[in-house]
Amino acid sequence: AKVLTLDLYKKLRDKSTPSGFTLDDIIQNEHLGYVLTCPSNLGTXLRAXVHV
């Protein structure tokens, strides 16, 4: 998997999806905050996990 480096982010930032969303629209949500790759990180930048 590639890491989202600043250079890669700059290349992707101005591209849009067929629906017209940009990368910034997708990773930042006004209600949830910054949406990361893991659902346990939604809006907090903290990670919660349960190990059984």
From Swiss-Prot:
Tissue-by-tissue expression: Expressed in rectal gland, brain, skeletal muscle (at protein level).
Entry binding sites for ATP: 13, 47
One GO cellular component term: basal plasma membrane
SUPFAM superfamilies in UniProt: Glutamine synthetase/guanido kinase, Guanido kinase N-terminal domain
Domain Phosphagen kinase C-terminal as annotated: residue spans: 1-52
Lineage: Eukaryota, Metazoa, Chordata, Craniata, Vertebrata
Listed InterPro entries: ATP-guanido_PTrfase, ATP-guanido_PTrfase_AS, ATP-guanido_PTrfase_cat, ATP-guanido_PTrfase_N, ATP-guanido_PTrfase_N_sf, Gln_synth/guanido_kin_cat_dom
Organism this protein belongs to: Squalus acanthias (Spiny dogfish)
Identification of the protein by name: Creatine kinase B-type
Recorded GO MF terms: ATP binding; creatine kinase activity
Main localization (coarse): cytoplasm
